[in-house]
Amino acid sequence: MQLKKTLIATVLVLAMGSSWAQADPARAQKIVMGSCFLCHGENGESSSEVFPKLAGQHANYIAKQLENFKTGQRKSTAMADMSSRLSPDEMLALGKYFEAKPSAPEPVEDANLAAVGSYIFHTGNTYSGVPACASCHGKEALGSANLPRLAGQYPEYIENQLKLFNQRERTNDNAVMHAIVSKMTPLEMAAVAAYVSGK
């Protein structure tokens, strides 16, 4: 029995090592400095709210978004072009590169708005049927391997993505998010964005 457990553990370690080997950090650095940094910054802290911060974002989530851009499941002319040159291993390598970078919270400009956002994020709105965002994205808005980290993201970017989900203009991951966001008011969207950006 002990030998069987040891063999299983060894296989898992080797598999993890293989995954990390495929996600070549040197290759990721080269790709970042060749193109990604122009919009997202060398360390994933983009200088404009038009472009999402990638620092601290989950590797699997980044890789999935790149794949969705490449296949056209998520629309963006610029990102479709960039991702068309990437292999799955390179996408994962970029994900791991940015996931390892520290992320800083955005300053809260409207404390009252953020307080409303905190309530919606943690409790939802029972009257309109909006569920608590924390039920999927976590109490600290850190997400999970397959769900995005929202903490520290630009509020303008988050608010815009919520609107795109509502209008079905963002077509990947749309079913669940559209069902939720379609019940939110513009104020609630802005409030949630203000709250999570400051975390």
Model-found features: residue ranges?
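Electrostatic cytochrome c docking/interface patches
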Residues: G17-V32, E45-V50, A100-Y127
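The canonical Cys-X-X-Cys-His
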Residues: C36-E42, L94, V130-K139, V192
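Sequence context surrounding c-type heme c attachment/ligation sites in exported
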Residues: A26-F37, A59, A63-K64, S118-A134, ...
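Bacterial N-terminal signal peptides that target proteins for export
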Residues: M1-I8
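Axial heme c-ligation environment in periplasmic c-type cytochrome domains
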Residues: S47-K53, N68-D110, S144-R149, N166-K199
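Periodic glycine anchor positions in long extracellular repeat architectures
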Residues: G41-G44, G56, G138, G152
